[in-house]
Each structure stands twice: as C-alpha cells, then as structure tokens.
Amino acid sequence: MEKQTGRPSQLITRKFANELHLNFMKYRASIIAKYIKKEDANAIWFSVEELENYIHYIKAKGKKTGFDVNGIRIYFGVYPDQKKYAEKAGLMTVFLQATGKEIRKAPKEGEVQTFALMMDSGEQDVSSIEPMNYGSIGRPPSLNY
C-alpha cells in the first residue's frame, strides 16, 4: 500500500481539541480524582517511531496468523494498584489493539462454501496479536491546542 501524504479527513481544529480536553477534565477527570483521591493521567504519549513500529509489527503478524489488519482500536484501562507499577499504579492508561478481518481462502474446485462462511466478519480484535501499552503518562504542559 502506498503511503498517503494528503491531509487526513479526521483532523479537528485546535479550538475543538481544547474543548474536548476541557470537557474531559470537567466531566470525567474531576469525578475520577474525587474517587481515587489523586490526580489521574489525562494524556498518554507514544513516539512516532513506537507507533510506526507497532503498525509494521501488527501488519506482519496479522499476515502470518491469517488476518488482514485494517485498524487499531484504542481501549481505556486502569493499572492495578500494585507497587510493581510504581507511579502508574491505579492510574488510567490506554492500550492499542490491532483489528482486522480473517483472510478467507477461496473454496477449492468442487467444494461448496456455505453462505455463513462467505459473509464478512467485520473489524474484530485480532487476538493473535498482542496489544501495545506503556506509553508515557502525560499531563500536557498546557492546553495549547
């Protein structure tokens, strides 16, 4: 697949990004902080190199395990409140999970394939590919979107 360098259609304005983040801080972070009695993470940072490496990895592993990887689903999570997680213990995180469609081989000559098997299964989490985590917990230096 050729790399696209055009402007992505999903871009938003800095003003709207600021509004989204302020809404999160007002309607989610403040409630969470009262419950866990400490300030939670409000951003997670991954380097471009880490993300590109993960994308390359999931495409290659998907192909090896019979999946056409077509996306990444981002899940929210919370680290266990255990010492081994140090400063991340009890804090929010995100992890990335490859999604895709199982590659279906065409039936051999003379074989009949049922309608159910021919149907598209849609974007599903690819359980044969490990999720990615361990970005840097960030508290953005300022809301300068």
Over which residues does each language-model region extend?
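Detector for the mature cores of small, proteolytically processed
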Residues: 1-49, 53, 60-70, 78-145
